[in-house]
């Protein structure tokens, strides 16, 4: 098929995340095969790909040119923030300010027990929060990272996005599994979701026991009471399964909304709520987005916008952030409800 577009991705990270970079490369190759059928290619550039032959530029200058030409810039951090990765991040920021590209996404891997982050990384995170309002993705395993990226890719390639589906706790694009929701904290650590999964497992056991044995009549037939009980168990299992499916879809939809935040500015409330959601703490995430506070800020933002002699880009962004808070609140509320009613 004719190639209509090439999505260029620049992946920046230090050597400490070599294994994650390798697996990410495999993901890109898988996605490239899927998108190729729609005339779209996905091209990944990493520092390992660079031709070391001298071409009149130092290597980092070449990397920086690649950053400017990319559609997506991904920076991965773990325990430290390398100076070249920071330089590439700043180049990407400047390019985005000038040409609205590349979209910038930052991933920070969770520390293991006993590990600590460097001062450089702590300062970089402070800069992103306090000065840039930039929200990063936290990940503890590759399922989480893959899911984040695929949702972000949907934002970049919005013209012909490939539908993300959830089937039996597996997030899929076409026939390819992207993530197991049992390994993603916003589902695996979600109390309601765990309770539903636990109840379904219990029902499966009870139905299995009833089907293999159960109470029998004098001539070996299954008793009327047992047949009724088995029918009730099957009916409840079907209901619980539908509740799980609804909540999985709502949770992934909320994660998609959060993906829209990532790579851009967001309010401190949105960032805190998103972090709590990612941890599976739906109730706390909802509580952070207090309606009285949001209404007061929205009223103030609208007043400033309406009374400005010439509305600025910052005033417009304030309005957009307020609207984003309400949208995120609605998504989080829905994602905490498994019952259809």
Residue map of PLM features:
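Conserved N-terminal substructure of TIR/SEFIR domains
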Residues: 1-72, 76, 98-102
């Amino acid at each position: 098929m004719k190639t209509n577009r090439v999505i260029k991705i620049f992946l920046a990270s230090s050597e400490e995340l070599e294994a994650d970079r390798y697996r990410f490369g495999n993901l890109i190759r898988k996605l490239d095969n899927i998108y190729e059928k729609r005339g779209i290619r996905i091209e990944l550039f990493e520092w390992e790909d660079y031709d070391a032959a001298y071409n009149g530029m130092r290597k980092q200058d070449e990397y920086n040119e690649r950053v400017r030409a990319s559609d997506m810039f991904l920076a991965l951090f773990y325990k430290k923030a390398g100076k070249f990765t920071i330089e590439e991040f700043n180049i990407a920021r400047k390019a985005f300010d000038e040409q609205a590209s590349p979209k910038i996404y930052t991933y920070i891997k969770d520390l293991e027990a006993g590990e600590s982050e460097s001062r450089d990384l702590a300062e970089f995170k402070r800069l992103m929060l306090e000065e840039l309002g930039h929200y990063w993705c936290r990940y503890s395993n590759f399922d989480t990272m893959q899911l984040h990226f695929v949702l972000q890719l949907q934002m970049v390639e919005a013209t012909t996005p490939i539908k993300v589906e959830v089937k039996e706790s597996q997030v899929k694009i076409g026939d390819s599994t992207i993530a197991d929701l049992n390994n993603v904290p916003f589902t695996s650590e979600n109390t309601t979701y765990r309770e539903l999964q636990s109840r379904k497992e219990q029902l499966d056991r009870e139905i299995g026991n009833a089907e293999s044995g159960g109470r029998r009549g004098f001539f070996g037939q299954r008793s009327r009471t047992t047949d009724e009980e088995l029918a009730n168990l099957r009916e409840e299992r079907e209901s619980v399964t539908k509740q799980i499916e609804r909540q999985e879809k709502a949770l992934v939809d909320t994660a998609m909304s959060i993906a829209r935040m990532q790579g851009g500015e967001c309010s401190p409330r949105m960032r805190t709520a998103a972090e709590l959601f990612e941890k599976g703490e739906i109730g706390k995430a909802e509580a952070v987005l207090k309606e009285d506070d949001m209404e007061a800020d929205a009223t103030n933002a609208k007043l400033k916008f309406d009374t400005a002699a010439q509305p600025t880009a910052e005033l417009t962004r304030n309005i957009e952030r307020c609207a984003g808070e309400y949208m995120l609140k609605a998504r989080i509320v829905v994602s905490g409800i498994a019952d259809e009613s």
